[in-house]
């Protein structure tokens, strides 16, 4: 019987359904109503390639009826973990991420494990096992917890004792009380809760020193130094909770942010393949089948009651929330989630512009302050990311009044001259912050210098791209385009504003003058006292400078530095 005919015979009850090809599992899913869900697959197959793949690769269809959806969820997780179906590929997290386990023994030690059921206190997870190995090595070197798997009783210690990696509890070379102090210190090191253990260590150091046990005192002193470095480097905490996993779904990426001891310790991106059918709760459920459930799980999408029950079966006191803390949200938006998807950008660009996506984009912005200190900025997008080494700032030389168009023309012309002279590479595209007026200025410069560059402008209020060939493209609903062009526009604006502020800053005077040979402390102070900004200094007449004892060459050197910036 073919699969379509089998679907008609499927039960209208909760359970799990399995697409197979002989012994190979193709896809496993769950449903409140098995037949209804399978009919949905069948219908979507006609429009979606990703659904059709399951049917094309399957020869058999099976199902298992359960009492409710919650039972179906648990069964689905077990089956996926056991059989690793082809089209549940993103759910195959295997044995989970490594953690450092502080063992629950008479003489505890640390070990790296992926088994969340082992007894002891787990710290992590570590997305990079090499980091876990380095930390374990540091713990043995600093706190000298035993290195053996099982602690035998023996008359002489092993080589690790002589190497300073173990305190030798197996040979009674350390008291149980002193070993417990080392364990407490190691735990503080792993958890970051250092301040609670430091007073005990200081007290013990004094006690050992008073009893002339200087070797023991030195051992604890080394621990204090390591732990004090943690205190000094903790900085600002991100969140007021000790332990939370944050999941952020954006486009075809699911991001995981791991917070431990109020700090962001790791993040990871799970890329979602469009050709696969993905249930985000299945993905998270499978992740927690082999990883530690934290005190709190936060997601920017709804988590069903059944999923929550499943997680609570692994940890009763777990809490859930849809509210991502603002400090972390800013980090997500600035550094990770807003990282543009290059392939999506190229696809959207070709679809909307009818031409190949640019690899090298130069984006321009003009900034001034109350009609003065007009500056220009250029930021660069190259091969899928910002290239800050190619950023340029421009101090406007030919315009003494408020005229953004004339200022832009100067900046673009100066840039064009370097391109024509082969000093710099020709970009694929110029993106100008502004509307049709700025676009016209870009086209004018392009035609004057005979440049082979695609000219566009981006109007901020409307979020519309205007192109030299007459297109007007609203980009807000095109995620990848909006990310790249919005990122470039905002970066150019930030870069220009920073330069503008620097020109208006008295502190910037000293910073710049320190780069010029022959300008000593006296001349720096004269310039600093008589000018409010570098802008005022380079605009001053030579006669005034002469009276102050400042040579014209210093002014020219400042101009050169500002021009190079």
From Swiss-Prot:
Coiled coil: none annotated. SMART domains: GIYc. It is found in: Cytoplasm. Its main location: cytoplasm. Keywords: Cytoplasm, DNA damage, DNA excision, DNA repair, Excision nuclease, SOS response. Residues 195-230 form the UVR domain. The UvrABC repair system catalyzes the recognition and processing of DNA lesions. UvrC both incises the 5' and 3' sides of the lesion. The N-terminal half is responsible for the 3' incision and the C-terminal half is responsible for the 5' incision. Interacts with UvrB in an incision complex. GO terms for biological process: nucleotide-excision repair; SOS response. The gene is uvrC. Residues 12-89 form the GIY-YIG domain. It comes from the Bacteria. One of its GO terms (cellular component) is excinuclease repair complex. One of its GO terms (molecular function) is excinuclease ABC activity. It holds the Pfam family UVR. Belongs to the UvrC family. This is UvrABC system protein C.
